[in-house]
């Protein structure tokens, strides 16, 4: 009888331990343990998006339940559309594939740009490490110091593709203000555009000003470039006298269109998950991203590399994508007409 009692007591303890273990189990950690999460970067390996991904990857591993590895997969092409289409339609929907897309991803969806096969606000945003402001950045050697100068003389700009702001913004500004920007597409990521500028194949671009400062500091040191106009809702912090394009247009519909373009900064380094990833895994990814951004070592790494560090919450990004998808039809028609999307 004593032996039977001891065995019963042991069984009770084992059952209790099992209940405690079950209660403490983390299905998200269990899923991610031993796995690799692929971060699809909608740009080439030489650009700022890749730099941010590489900086944050070890911190995401640290804070994500199960501590999976995070690896970068560059998927430039079509101005970010290729990567967005992949994440929306082809990538695993289990949380082992996430992405960092371009600021124009949402707008390209609303414009129904060529090749777009996704709906922007269906993505599940995770957060952003920067809110990059855009501008027209040109070599001074071309003698164009203002938008007015660009109305009188053609200048060749580089672009990653027709779905990217490097193409859409100058093309729309040509239609709205009469500038003569000639845009050459097809470069693999902004790294490709920078190389084309180094070789003097092109003489400028419309894109993120902050990226120039840490990817081509020699242009600044040698006083080679001019920033002639900003395409943003607020002035460039370090160049507050650079005029805003939105203040140059008088037509109300054009003004709304420019503001729609300029408001995309919050999506500029936007991390997101495909639409089918389960909610509990998305929540864990969002939490890990925010903890990674707040980590003092991550911030120090950004400062060392002279990278801007300006958080956008996933809620702000989700709301902005929703606003773009619901943008006024008249404004979208004007933008489509300017881009020749008939």
Task: Walk through the language-model features, giving the residues of each.
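Hinge/capping helix and adjacent helix->loop/strand transition within the periplasmic-binding protein
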Residues: 37, 62-67, 86-97, 105-199, ...
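Bacterial N-terminal signal peptides
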Residues: 8-18
